[in-house]
Design a protein with these regions (language model features):
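Anion-binding alpha/beta catalytic cores of soluble intermediary-metabolism enzymes, centered on
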Residues: 1-192
Length: 192
């Protein structure tokens, strides 16, 4: 049906030009499985963020024989990312030390700065974090598209014979007419 056709189109498009995806919750079993599947099927180039030893241990325990790319804040220098975060947020009161601390201990900030600097094309997060705290770093670091004044969440529901896009059931509480109009416009563009 339409659901299967939609997924085939999306997967084929992804496989034709695999993107680097930072998985912020890189030590989570589901994220490691997702990284394996993304890499195995050529859908994307996953980059797991977190403790490399823990990620390797979990992957082995799951019987996954792959060596994912890992950015481990405890084993790698993240100075360039801290510098960039400081540049972006210093006028909002963040110190250089706080920027270093954020990229070293909060993989949502690390992944967001990686995307902002072009070291990743996208970031996947929100599985184990409280939604607002998972959304805050990307909004602070990456922001919204140039033609967007508001961020919004979109869910894609696939049924046997149809596909439904549910826009902004997660971000804007009690949106006014302007927010609804913009979210509707951008969701329609996404659906096309």
């Amino acid at each position: 049906g339409k659901s299967r056709e939609m997924m085939r189109i999306v997967l084929n498009k992804a496989k034709s030009d695999p993107k680097r995806v930072a998985l912020a919750e890189g030590t989570d079993e589901k994220m490691i499985r997702a990284a394996y599947q993304l890499e195995e099927e050529g859908i994307a180039e996953p980059v797991l963020l977190g403790d490399k030893n823990e990620i390797t241990r979990i992957a082995t325990q799951l019987g996954l024989s792959f060596e994912p790319e890992v950015v481990d804040p405890q084993q790698q220098s993240l100075e360039a990312y801290a510098d960039r975060l400081y540049e972006l947020r210093q006028r909002k009161g963040i110190t250089r030390g706080e920027a270093t601390d954020l990229v070293e201990r909060d993989t949502n900030y690390l992944g967001s700065v990686m995307v902002e600097m072009g070291d990743a094309d996208a970031m996947l997060t929100g599985l184990t974090h409280h939604y607002p705290s998972a959304l805050r770093p990307p909004l602070q670091v990456i922001g919204t598209a140039e033609d967007a004044n508001y961020a919004a969440g979109v869910y894609l529901l696939t049924f046997k014979n149809r596909v439904v896009f549910c826009a902004d059931t997660t971000v804007n509480q009690n949106p006014d007419a302007d927010v609804l109009a913009e979210v509707t416009k951008h969701t329609a563009e996404l659906a096309r």
